From Swiss-Prot:
Function: Metallothioneins have a high content of cysteine residues that bind various heavy metals.
Keyword Metal-binding carried by entry: yes
Residues engaged in binding a divalent metal cation 2: 8, 14, 16, 27
Coiled-coil intervals, chain numbering: none
Positions of a divalent metal cation 4 binding: 34-35, 45, 49
Record PROSITE patterns: METALLOTHIONEIN_VRT
Residues that coordinate or bind a divalent metal cation 5: 35, 37-38, 51
Binding site for a divalent metal cation 1: 6, 8, 22, 25
Name of the protein this chain belongs to: Metallothionein
A biological-process GO annotation: cellular response to copper ion
Organism phylogeny: Eukaryota, Metazoa, Chordata, Craniata, Vertebrata
Amino acid sequence: MDPQDCACATGASCTCAGSCKCKNCKCTSCKKSCCSCCPAGCAKCAKSCVCKEPLSDKCSCCT
C-alpha cells in the first residue's frame, strides 16, 4: 500500500505506483496518480494532479 505522503523531492522522479494516493505528491513523474478520483471542477486537483477516472463527489487528495 502506498504511503499518504511521497517522500521524494520537488520535481524529482519517484516510484509511486499507479494507485498511489499521496496527498502531497511533488514528483513530476507521478502527479497523474495523486488523486484516484475527483469531482468535476475540483480546483485543488486541477492545480497539482491529473485525476484518474471514475469521477466522484469526493476526492482522495482534497479530504
